[in-house]
Amino acid sequence: RVTDQTEVLLIGGRSGVGKSTVGYEIHAQLSATGVPHCLIEGDNLDMAYPPPWEHSLAEKNLTAVWANYHALGYRRMIYTNTASVLKKVITDLTAAIGDDPHVTAVLLRCSDTTAHHRLSQREIGTALDQHVERSALMARTLDERAPRWAHRVQTDDRTVADIAAEIIGLAGWVAE
């Protein structure tokens, strides 16, 4: 379907659930079928030390980046970030995007065992246990606080291609 309205696909979830991997696979599948879109990794919009969170840098950078995509005719954005499916964050992100976007929110979920396995593949040293603990706490927080209308998608024992295809279907993003 051709649209002039901005559509945003928010993908959130705990560390180790597969947000980035799924985001890149959605990008690959949409590209293969000719669906115009952009992919923005939210963590990269304010990754700095000391953390600039109190200055809303992620939102300011999202406004600037999206303005450039929008000027080139893009109307669909995939946005990945842990907390992107929480109501306050959704409100802040849609305000940063402007244009009253249509939002599809997807909370990726996995078991503690799966998250531990995935995190142990990328985290090294003594920080792994802390990271696993924070991930489990965030999983509970996201599950409790994400709005009911946000889709919950389980990632355990599934291929990335299958998860991405399901999410593309939830967003209704098909080739025009």
Predicted features along the sequence, with ranges:
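Phosphate-binding P-loop
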Residues: 1-6
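Hydrophobic anchor at the beta1->P-loop junction of P-loop NTPases
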Residues: 11
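Walker A (P-loop) phosphate-binding loop of P-loop NTPases
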Residues: 16
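Conserved lysine of the Walker
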Residues: 19
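Conserved substrate/cofactor phosphate-moiety recognition/catalytic segment
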Residues: 23-67
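Glycine-rich phosphate-binding loop used to anchor ATP phosphates in small-molecule kinases
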Residues: 57-100
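Conserved phosphate-donor/acceptor-positioning beta-strand/loop module used by diverse small-molecule
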Residues: 99-120, 153
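Small-molecule kinase domains that catalyze NTP-dependent phosphoryl transfer to phosphate-bearing small molecules
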Residues: 124-166, 173-176
